[in-house]
Amino acid sequence: GIFLSPGAVAKLVGSKAAMIYLAAAAFAAVLAVTFAAASKYVVKSGAAYAYSKAAFGDEVGSYVGITRVVSASIAWGVLATGVVKTALSIFGKDSSDMKTVTIGFITLMVVLLIINLIGTKLLTIISNISTIGKIGALGITIIAGIFILVFSDGANLQDLTILKDADGKNIIPEFTTSVFVTALVGAFYAFTGFESVASGSADMEKPEKNLPRAIPLAIGIIACIYFGIVFVSMYIDPVAMVTSKEPVVLASVFKNQILQKIIIIGALMSMFGINVAASFLTPRVFEAMAQEKQVPEFFTKRTKGGLPLTSFILTAGIAV
């Protein structure tokens, strides 16, 4: 999300990074409104799968469902890797060692399985704590960044134009349509999640009433925060945004170690919360397909805590 994507976006578009996030927010808002409208009429689990099946029939629904399960599982795997690498960097371990990362990854999956087996109450508590940690870290960063900008001259964005790689070529490429689209996709990744919110709507209270309100509101709040954090970071130290090799690039912008720790811990809490959400929502897409008899029905079997265990194992396997 916002902790992992800014560096890649800044390397593509330089000083235009904050504007790219605004453009990505606009696209996300359009899709969010679409999902919000659909959630009024279809309250089954599965989100995009359930909506497309209701609108276009079984064949399209099946295609969207399978695509969604695979893509969501892969995204879950990427996010899980991010959590492991961030945790390793916090404890001073080598985050590039594949053996260590793999052990951490499998350990994380076991922890997520245990959390899901306990039930939705624990999931809700963890999600709320991670949200508070994420918003708190980003909010503190924005406020601190504004103070730094007010009481200092800030950085010169033109410094990005003179950055060269080992071959003497500009690190920031020429701004073209292709570069814009690539950067937009990278920034859009920070907004992903709203399309999964309705995946477990059958386990929510009054989804037809609450989801149409929650999805657009969440996108609006997130867009403001994300724009603020990228804007402030680019004006504090744009060179660090582009050249840093750290997993959490935003921490490299600040020289203050306390701020760095706040950002890294906030990133870890956020990414862990996203993994918890992914472990809850992703299996339920495949479960929804099983309920519609488009995949074997044994994927609908749940534990006493309400976990579709076979669907969880399948999606976790794809993530691994």
Model-derived features: positions:
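The first (N-terminal) embedded transmembrane alpha-helix
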Residues: 1-5, 189, 318
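Membrane-interface loop-to-helix entry segments
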Residues: 87, 100-158, 192, 215-220
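TM-loop-TM module centered on a large, flexible mid-protein loop between adjacent transmembrane helices
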Residues: 50-51, 57, 89-94, 165, ...
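Inter-helical loop and helix-membrane interface segments of multi-pass membrane transporters/permeases
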Residues: 80-108, 152-180
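Helix-loop junctions at the membrane interface of multi-pass solute transporters
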Residues: 7-9, 49-55, 180-210, 214, ...
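Membrane-helix boundary/coupling elements in multi-pass transport proteins
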Residues: 3, 44, 67-82, 191, ...
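Hydrophobic, small-residue-rich membrane helices and short re-entrant helix-turn-helix hairpins
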Residues: 118-128, 194-225, 290-305
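Extracellular loop-to-transmembrane helix junctions
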Residues: 4-99, 104, 218-221
